[in-house]
């Protein structure tokens, strides 16, 4: 892990903390990923990609209030960040904040990502908005 390399001075190459965090997220090491993302953020403060990954890690460990705050931070620096609108929208819906969640899903769909992997997120947002329009409300978090 890059943290140990930095502490003990192993290797001459700079550590890519962002990439390290992404890899840690993939294998379910959410707390370790948070550490890597925080180190990456020190190198590039206000980086939307790093902040979004932090929000994802918070969500996965159940710290949804922190995830909401982090997504809001992303949007305060970068208002058009589609991924932050998507993540925030669904978190707000789970918290029972339907109007605000719906607004963020609509903002996500105004400028959705066009990558192949994003298609399922776009479809999920559209389906959710259709369900909301039919009066089917997601259950709030307990």
Regions found by a protein language model. Give the residues of each.
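Alpha-helical segment of the N-proximal tetratricopeptide repeat
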Residues: 11-46
